[in-house]
Amino acid sequence: MLVLGLETSCDETGVALYDSERGLLADALFSQIDLHRAYGGVVPELASRDHVKRMLPLIRQVLAEADCVPTEIDAIAYTAGPGLVGALLVGASCAQALAFAWGIPALGVHHMEGHLLAPMLEEQPPQFPFVALLVSGGHTQLVRVDGIGQYELLGETLDDAAGEAFDKTAKMIGLNYPGGPEIARLATQGVAGRFVFPRPMTDRPGLDFSFSGLKTFALNTWQQCVSAGDDGEQTRCDISLAFQQAVVETLTIKCKRALKQTGLKRLVIAGGVSANKALRASLEKMLAEMKGNVFYARPEFCTDNGAMIAFAGCQRLQAGQQESLAISVQARWPMEQLSAL
């Protein structure tokens, strides 16, 4: 089965072609980072307009790269949520229109299920069951995964997502958007131990997260440094390191608890923050000590992309899942509501 995947949940326009027998044939991505940088974050209306501008050229690019014509495509998968409604509607409308014109089915895919399954595009994919850490700008969740659509939520953030906390903290100390990569970059030049930030909710049982207090702690630390006239580049580096260490250690502690609670030895990390090198190193060390394995997607498939949507859609379409031509998207969509295959 040959599936065209379309991703437009936020500020990246992603298109890909995935074949159930040959694997990923082509993928293309346009990031809107430069467009939103001047505003310090994503502007929904601008995101939607840019998706409209980029979608068809990217589809043509992917078809040309794969040497494919529309008559060869068996189905279209598109991100139906969660995400920005206007942005989602661009992808959904395009998918349904093309599906109607080409006489093929279109299927809405859950954005986070796409992220969760992205490591399966690698040469050594994880086997079910496993624990997944979904960590991005909008989500921080621990999920037990027994199969596609068989998801048990173990814990989630009670306020800010980890990626959101990265971006907001970066903005508070004067770094550019997107803040996560900027903090990671400065952290490599930080002096360890100058600042020590708390590891939120690790002193109590449970698998939930909270990052709003950590963000406030970072802000107070920065304001104290500014008041003392110590607001130079090295202080930004030191705060970045302390903040990143706190987030990474918190996520690692919670992942270890989840693995012990479930008795599993396989961990998948997915979502934009999973590209963070410090997080990967920490989880790899923890899994090595537990004699387990950690899996993640290649860096370009950690952030939003069309390949993960094409793959996830292909799995569901092959299992017989169908959808009407109605255009329906959801800004909020709990993954536990998905049907099992």
From Swiss-Prot:
<keyword id="KW-0408">Iron</keyword>
<dbReference type="Pfam" id="PF00814">
    <property type="entry name" value="TsaD"/>
</dbReference>
<dbReference type="InterPro" id="IPR043129">
    <property type="entry name" value="ATPase_NBD"/>
</dbReference>
<dbReference type="GO" id="GO:0061711">
    <property type="term" value="F:N(6)-L-threonylcarbamoyladenine synthase activity"/>
</dbReference>
<comment type="function">
    <text>Required for the formation of a threonylcarbamoyl group on adenosine at position 37 (t(6)A37) in tRNAs that read codons beginning with adenine. Is involved in the transfer of the threonylcarbamoyl moiety of threonylcarbamoyl-AMP (TC-AMP) to the N6 group of A37, together with TsaE and TsaB. TsaD likely plays a direct catalytic role in this reaction.</text>
</comment>
<keyword id="KW-0012">Acyltransferase</keyword>
<dbReference type="InterPro" id="IPR000905">
    <property type="entry name" value="Gcp-like_dom"/>
</dbReference>
<feature type="binding site">
    <location>
        <position position="304"/>
    </location>
    <ligand>
        <name>Fe cation</name>
    </ligand>
</feature>
<dbReference type="InterPro" id="IPR017861">
    <property type="entry name" value="KAE1/TsaD"/>
</dbReference>
<dbReference type="InterPro" id="IPR022450">
    <property type="entry name" value="TsaD"/>
</dbReference>
<keyword id="KW-0479">Metal-binding</keyword>
<dbReference type="GO" id="GO:0005506">
    <property type="term" value="F:iron ion binding"/>
</dbReference>
<protein>
    <recommendedName>
        <fullName>tRNA N6-adenosine threonylcarbamoyltransferase</fullName>
        <ecNumber>2.3.1.234</ecNumber>
    </recommendedName>
</protein>
<keyword id="KW-0819">tRNA processing</keyword>
<feature type="binding site">
    <location>
        <position position="115"/>
    </location>
    <ligand>
        <name>Fe cation</name>
    </ligand>
</feature>
<keyword id="KW-0808">Transferase</keyword>
<feature type="binding site">
    <location>
        <position position="167"/>
    </location>
    <ligand>
        <name>substrate</name>
    </ligand>
</feature>
<comment type="similarity">
    <text>Belongs to the KAE1 / TsaD family.</text>
</comment>
<feature type="binding site">
    <location>
        <begin position="134"/>
        <end position="138"/>
    </location>
    <ligand>
        <name>substrate</name>
    </ligand>
</feature>
<keyword id="KW-0963">Cytoplasm</keyword>
<dbReference type="GO" id="GO:0005737">
    <property type="term" value="C:cytoplasm"/>
</dbReference>
<dbReference type="GO" id="GO:0002949">
    <property type="term" value="P:tRNA threonylcarbamoyladenosine modification"/>
</dbReference>
<feature type="binding site">
    <location>
        <position position="111"/>
    </location>
    <ligand>
        <name>Fe cation</name>
    </ligand>
</feature>
<feature type="binding site">
    <location>
        <position position="180"/>
    </location>
    <ligand>
        <name>substrate</name>
    </ligand>
</feature>
<feature type="binding site">
    <location>
        <position position="276"/>
    </location>
    <ligand>
        <name>substrate</name>
    </ligand>
</feature>
